[in-house]
Swiss-Prot record:
Organism: Mus musculus
Coiled coil segments of this chain: none
Gene Ontology biological-process annotations: autophagy
Protein's name according to its UniProt entry: Modulator of macroautophagy TMEM150B
Alphabetical list of InterPro entries matching this protein: DRAM/TMEM150_Autophagy_Mod, Frag1/DRAM/Sfk1
Amino acid sequence: MWNYLSLLPVILFLWAIAGIWIVFAIAVVNGSVDLNEGFPFISICGSYAPQSCIFGQVLNIGAALTVWICIVRHHQLRDWGVKTWQNQLILWSGILCALGTSIVGNFQDKNQKPTHLAGAFLAFILGNLYFWLQFFLSWWVKGLPQPGPHWIKSLRLSLCSLSTILIVAMIVLHALHMRSASAICEWVVAMLLFMLFGFFAVDFSILRGCTLHLHPRLDSSLPQAPSGSPNIQMAQVL
């Protein structure tokens, strides 16, 4: 049964893809990029006003959704008995991917190129690593639940492999000054990563919801709650 948590990956997928293609369309229409000179990188499309404002907002909201998804996934893996160090490694690679996405949106290529490239490294490289770690985890941990149809695992492997190949191709082609080919690889990698995040909808479909637990500090100087008072240690996250 689908729930609001399973909608998060779908919302991220639709939001990110629609957002960056809208930015591309605006850049082409207002002449910020010229397709006759070659296919542009995503960052070039988002470097000039007014689409730079939209670009930053799209990536900031996308980064926030990514962090939310990574945290939900972290707790899901924890409840499945995944070791803490493995789960923490996966979580932080996802959070750093989200941080890189936000950096890319806020530090445009034409204004702060070194910072922008650092953000792109986090977004693409660690984003790809995040999904490889998720995939390898399904092999490391025996008996780990595999929600969804059996072909999902094979599809994720294919998408991760293609993403890795295209990242390498993107870097090599850029070094060879084949910018249009490199830019096309970048766009495809971005679409693949959005798709991989979107597939978390399958994993989250078995969840009913999530709760936030508040643990009060143990201090004898604090007044004790009166008998019969409402339990304030758990609040439902809406």
